[in-house]
Amino acid sequence: MTGRTAMRALITGVGGQDGSYLAERLVAEGLEVHALVHPDEPLPERPGVTLHACDVADTARTRALVRDLVPDELYNLAAISSVARSWSEPDLVARVNGLAVAGLLESAWLAQEASGRPVRFVQASSAEIFGAPCRSPQDESTPIRPVNPYGAAKAYAHHLVGVYRERGLHASGLVLYNHESPRRPVQFVTRKITSTVAAIAQGRADVLRLGNLAARRDWGWAPDYVDAMVRSARAGHADDYVVATGESHSVRDLVAVAFAHVGIDDWERFVEVDQALVRPTDAADLVGDSSRIRAALGWCPTATFHDVVTRLVAADLDTWEGS
């Protein structure tokens, strides 16, 4: 391990949106990149990345892998990221989004202690840890009060990051607000909206069914949030950071911008509200104050809300046209 010439990184969740962008960036920077892939999932195409079949919740396997690799940077992006699924499978979400993080943090600390080589840990946390926040916008001092099983598991992991930071691990928790890209799965509301709008524009669909149109979120561009991860890993000291644009928009706003991009202004005639799609407990107005990471690490978003939505619609139009 002491003879390595390149920085080494280990990524969990490489099959997802953020993991794909992160892997591409680190490979381009010349790092030796390794990644975990669940044994039951197909291997993603990640050029330049060494893939390891391993369940992130298998503590013994992950501990052995981290011990053998001793990564300079460890990014934990693996998670079940559906709030809706956390209501139907709360035990699984707790294991993957919470307990698995405990195992990874301990593995990183043990590898660091045994090798004498620092391991820098980045945890992808979520604005859902704030639940129904008592103030808006939220920052790092906002009380953590999750209102769903997903948020609760992420909150547990977020607290653990602080515990291991005090123990001597360079561990940062990034409270990531909603961030999108064409690589976001279509089951998420942003992609559901933009893909359906693109289909309607091409005569392939005639209705968009949604839940709560008034729900508000802080939506950003995924590659910007990956940049925040890398900056936090390489910062002089570890900390927790809210990563957000600072702007709140409703689902209704998103729908309007998406339809406007395809030349449809009277979009209400295409939208149906389905109460079955409303979450049992939906978080209130989630909008983040990212002043700390902007000041400390020089991070700032590069894409506006309008940029994000129109990029998604354009990508979905291309997909439909190519099908």
Positions of the model-derived regions?
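N-terminal Rossmann NAD(P)H-binding glycine-rich loop of SDR-like oxidoreductase domains
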Residues: 9-29
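Conserved glycine-rich Rossmann-like NAD(P)H-binding loop of the short-chain dehydrogenase/reductase
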Residues: 31-41
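Conserved Rossmann-fold cofactor-binding substructure of NAD(P)-dependent oxidoreductases
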Residues: 53-73
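Conserved internal alpha-helix within the Rossmann fold of NAD(P)-dependent oxidoreductases
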Residues: 59, 101-104, 229
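N-terminal Rossmann-like NAD(P) cofactor-binding module of classical short-chain dehydrogenase/reductase
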Residues: 73-75, 122
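Conserved NAD(P)H cofactor-binding loop of Rossmann-fold oxidoreductase domains
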Residues: 77-81, 125-126
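Catalytic helix-loop patch of NAD(P)-dependent Rossmann-fold dehydrogenases
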Residues: 88-106, 116-123, 128-173, 180-184
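C-terminal substrate-binding subdomain of Rossmann-fold SDR/epimerase-dehydratase oxidoreductases
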Residues: 190-191, 196-323
